[in-house]
Design a protein with these regions (language model features):
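Short, acidic, metal-binding catalytic loop of nucleotide-sugar glycosyltransferases
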Residues: 21-31
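A conserved acidic beta->alpha catalytic loop
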Residues: 22, 38-47, 93-94
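Glycine-rich, basic loop-to-helix element that forms the pyrophosphate-binding segment
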Residues: 64-81
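Acidic donor-binding loop at a coil-to-helix junction in glycosyltransferase catalytic cores
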Residues: 188-195
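Non-catalytic, C-terminal membrane-associated alpha-helical segments of glycosyltransferases
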Residues: 238-239, 256-315
Length: 315
């Protein structure tokens, strides 16, 4: 069994170099491909990818910069994949030498086609490349550990296991139905929860591979608005709130609606800033949803082109 590793990236050439260096240390017999999916980077991302030609079975794909389109970028990787399983990792993580093998082992051990997720621990400091698994586990723990345990055993009884599927670290067998990101999610947030939900609804259990951890190196200016908020930086929740309403509206599931509504009660439209903000007290959820639906309708005629329309280039 071999894996295709799909890496969406934008303007993080130095981080990408570190991740690719980690992948060089994997058992190369486990790697079918490493697909770098460039979301229109203006930096030297292409040159970094080129530098690993011959060291990794690397494929480079590029789409025009039309805003944050991580889902479209990952779909480029899916279309290129030749491995038995497709692994998704973000461009700002580091992995231990047995990372790919840990994902493959989890799939081999599963008696069914499964969604395999690994934890994402955090660090604010650089580390040796590749980091050891022990170093990763000793870093700031993934929030999901609290809910489903260090070994992930708690996910089996969880009513909404799809909510734990983060695109920074999960894998699925190639050819699994529903294995495609919804390209109507634009900007940061929830395209990964959506694909996790659809895969789960299609009958694929979500399981945890405890050894398949990644170490997320925190950016000075993170794209995640929740991390911005934690670090006292001005967060932008616009795409997250719109994507949450899109996620809720596309699925006729009471659990999804309740999950989204529970979250949206904390947001309000700041007309002075022209942005959605998280203000810390409960608001009229229906007003938030109605306003977001109006924004989504207004944007419907000007959505970014799909991955099929994007320019792609091979090394």
């Amino acid at each position: 069994m071999k894996a295709t590793v799909v890496i969406p990236t934008y303007n993080r050439a130095s981080r990408l170099r570190e991740l690719l260096s980690c992948l060089v240390h994997q058992d190369q017999e486990t790697l079918a491909q490493v697909v770098v999916c460039d979301d229109g980077s203006p930096d030297d991302t292409r040159a970094v990818a080129n530098a690993f030609e011959g060291k990794l079975p690397l494929v480079y794909r590029h789409q025009e910069d039309r805003g944050f389109r991580a889902g479209q970028a990952r779909n480029m990787g899916i279309s290129e994949a030749r491995g038995d399983i497709i692994m998704f990792v973000d461009d700002d993580v580091l992995v231990a030498p047995d990372f790919v093998a840990a994902h493959i082992a989890a799939h081999r051990a599963s008696k069914r086609t499964s969604v395999v997720l690994g934890y994402r621990h955090r660090s604010h400091e650089a580390t040796v490349i590749p980091p050891t698994l022990e170093h990763i586990v000793a870093s700031e723990a993934d929030d999901r550990v609290v809910e489903i345990g260090p070994d992930g055993a708690g996910i089996a009884a969880h009513k909404m296991p799809w909510m734990f599927v983060y695109s920074c670290n999960f894998s699925v067998p190639r050819g699994t139905p529903e294995l495609s990101f919804d390209e109507r999610f634009l900007g940061w947030g929830l395209e990964d929860i959506d694909i996790g939900y659809r895969l789960w609804r299609a009958g694929n259990p979500v399981i945890v591979a405890p050894r398949a951890c990644v170490l997320h190196i925190e950016d000075v200016a993170p794209r995640d608005p929740f991390r911005c908020e934690e670090r006292k930086l001005p967060p932008t929740y616009d795409s997250y709130v719109r994507n949450a309403v899109h996620f809720m509206d596309k699925h006729e599931d009471a659990a999804v609606r309740a999950w989204v509504r529970n979250d949206l009660r904390w947001y309000v439209r700041d007309e002075e800033r022209g942005a959605w903000v998280k203000n810390g007290y409960e608001n009229d959820v229906e007003a938030v949803i109605s306003a977001c639906r109006a924004e989504l309708r207004a944007r419907a005629g000007a959505l970014a082109p799909t991955q099929a329309d994007a320019r792609t280039e091979a090394l």
